[in-house]
Amino acid sequence: MKKLLLLTISILICVSMSAQNPPITPAWAFEHVAWEDSINTADGAKALVDGYLERNIPVGAVIIDSPWSTTYNDFNWDTQRYSDPKDMINYFKSKDVKVLLWLTGAVNIKCKDTRFQKSDTYDEVVSKGYGINQGKPHVWWKGEGVHIDFTNKEAVAWWYKQLDKVFIDGVYGWKVDQGEFWFGDILDTSIGQMSNEQFRPYYYDAMYDYTVKKNPQGIIIARPYSHQGGYAASVEKMNMGWCGDFSGDWKGLKLQIQNIYQSAKRGYGSPGCEVAGFFMKRSNKEQFVRYAQFGCMTACMINGGENGAFSNHLPWWHGTDVENIYRYCVVLHDELIPYLFSTVVDAHLHGGSLIKNASYEEESHQVGDYLFTKAITSADNRVSFHLPSEGEWINFYDGTKYAPGSLIEEVYALERFPLFVKAGAILPLNVTSGLTGLGDASMVGRKTIMIYPNGTATRQLHLPCGDGIEYEDCLVTYDEKTGKLKVSSGTSQKYTFILKNMPSVKKVKNVASWKYNAEKQELRIDVEGSTLDIEIR
């Protein structure tokens, strides 16, 4: 009986731990997000996205921020701003850009900047008891209204029907903004009084549940930890984090880093970065670049805001050099998506975050197990920091090797930032061009895996099968001493392996083709199959 009790307790603990693991973030959601919250029209959103695409800066999604509806959260498009919403959504769909819509959980009687003041659903919400605090209106940052009681199942079902009006093909989720924070420290709900903090998961969980049920590739962008109110969304029901709001100066960047690190330590899987902040002070040239470089080493680069959406937030506004740097950051981040995705799947299965080993003091962190970066947060490009205490680390740019825990003191030109790869790394990539130097256009459509040999290295990769959350496991092992590279996966795939720091290569067996670059000490192997046994001599 005692053994049975211990087994039961053990199972309950495991279930509890599993329930706190973050969800899998769809592969597409790691892509660059443009955020239009300035002009707030269809033309403005199109101009923003097209501005990037015309300059060969990839965009994966666009946030349509408020006011896009006739009153907040009535889910009726304001056709004076967006004359043909379906046409706009299809326009973005034709460019493979997904649409995300802003919302909060409040229904207003007075609005700040919408076409109408009172929502056409306000009276219904109050009369049916769908609001918290007995349906009494309260002033919040977008006017005055009542907040939906997400503890009330009937209210949630009604809310979902409202969402159905706009959650159509091409719309992939929501920027779930903060409204509940303004409705009091203690709230009256359908299940009794509770603190504001206790109420928040009901709101964010409801939005997550609706979204992924309607579209398994859908996301909510929501606050994990924020200095504006603490923890918000549930760890297990938030697939993209945004800690907002921040200023665009050094102070804002430093504060955002602290927020992101706090979120990661809590176990949020995919904290992203609000590049150049959202409000108050605007980024100058140096601040914008350092923001982008830090952002590309988080889950997502989310760029836009009211502090210069069509000026300081645009890389080309700062000059051609910044445009080139920003393009590099976005493309590098895109190339890393299979690695980011695989790391977040690990976090989903075992707990943890994409961002690991974060140091508040040195403003540094690991991206997964194999990459390390340090943010530059001042106009002084000279930085001092320590590499992680475990493993040998390799400078991403020049291949210089460093012992564990090494102190790095270096001046970084604007186009460079501290980035290191752990020896023994096995990095799945999606390389489509030669922009970053990791590969070239011949790798399009292939599973590219980069290996930094260090004794015997093995990694179970979770490779995305498309844009969503589906993946296939692929076990990769490389033995530096024997020169054997083994791969085991469920289906046959076209692979390109890039092995770094290879002093010499004379022969490679059991592959379609191989090429050795003696100057770069780099070996490229092209091969196809599900079970591979490659010999390198």
Spans of model-derived segments:
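Secondary-structure transition/turn motif
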Residues: 388-389, 488-493, 526-532
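Catalytic-domain carbohydrate-binding cleft regions of carbohydrate-active enzymes
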Residues: 18-416
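Residues that act as N-cap/strand-start positions at coil-to-secondary-structure junctions
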Residues: 379, 413, 468-472, 491-493, ...
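Bacterial Sec-dependent N-terminal signal peptides
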Residues: 1-19
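C-terminal beta-strand-rich structural cap/linker in extracellular carbohydrate-active enzymes
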Residues: 405-451, 518-537
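Solvent-exposed beta-hairpin/edge-strand motifs
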Residues: 386-398, 498-513
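Accessory, solvent-exposed terminal regions and/or long lumenal/extracellular loops of proteins
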Residues: 423-511
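Generic recognition of long tandem-repeat/solenoid scaffolds
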Residues: 481-489, 515-528
